[in-house]
Regions:
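Generic preference for hydrophobic/aromatic residues in regular secondary structure cores
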Residues: 1, 11-15, 168, 183, ...
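Extracellular, surface-exposed repeat/solenoid domains
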Residues: 1-26
């Protein structure tokens, strides 16, 4: 039997007296498995932040005179397989309306705490971006967002034998989003329908992580 270390899981080989193999079993390393889950959770966080300025853009379409400084705070939780994450996000920005166009910039910070079966994480994510758009008099609009992201995770894990493994996991990402829609008012009411289509593209750099 070979015991689990920080990279390789448990493996058991049973031999006959003549040296022939009876059975071989291998168990996945739980630290490696947890690092993969942390990476997946960071990807989901990155995905959620690609177009998180869309609510602000909706405000600008609904209230033409609402340009200027703005801020938004969000708290929530997410889950992926056996990792559970709670987070708080602070987002700030400023924009300017110029005729049927508007331009703006935004920055956000997210602090999160993750719980796994064999440890925990402390997550810190930053993003910076520019956005702009066009709003036609007949209700058509185009929104564009370009952002840069930084994702950092400090993790404290343990192997099946109880050996502690801690370290840092970090990467950078870039994203862009383009949305087209048409706000169609319903006659004699305050209601409207808004068909829309959005194209999002993002890239996360290769991940770097260090352990003790």
């Amino acid at each position: 039997t070979a015991r689990e270390n920080t990279l390789i899981g448990n493996s058991t080989l049973i031999l006959n007296p003549d040296g022939t193999i009876v059975s071989y079993t291998e168990q996945k390393n739980i630290v490696t498995d947890s690092l993969q889950k942390i990476g997946a959770m960071n990807f989901l966080t990155f995905r959620a932040q690609i177009n998180d300025v869309s609510k602000r853009m909706g405000d600008l379409r609904s209230m033409p005179q609402a340009d200027g400084m703005w801020a938004r705070a969000v708290a929530g939780q997410s889950e992926y397989k056996s990792i559970h994450n709670t987070y708080q996000t602070l987002q700030i920005g400023a924009d300017k309306r110029i005729g049927n166009f508007y331009v703006g910039g935004t920055a956000s910070y997210t602090d999160g705490d993750g719980k796994l079966d064999n440890g925990s994480t402390d997550d810190k994510n930053w993003s910076f971006g520019l956005y702009g758009g066009w709003i036609a008099d007949d209700g058509q609009y185009v929104d564009i967002i370009i952002k840069r992201h930084k994702l950092d995770t400090d993790f404290d894990l343990h192997t099946q034998s109880g050996t502690g493994v801690n370290g840092r996991y970090h990467t950078w990402g870039t994203s862009a989003s383009v949305e087209y829609g048409w706000r169609l008012g319903i006659a004699d009411t305050d209601y409207y329908i808004e068909p829309q289509a959005e194209l999002m593209i993002g890239h996360l750099n290769g991940v770097s992580h260090t352990t003790n």
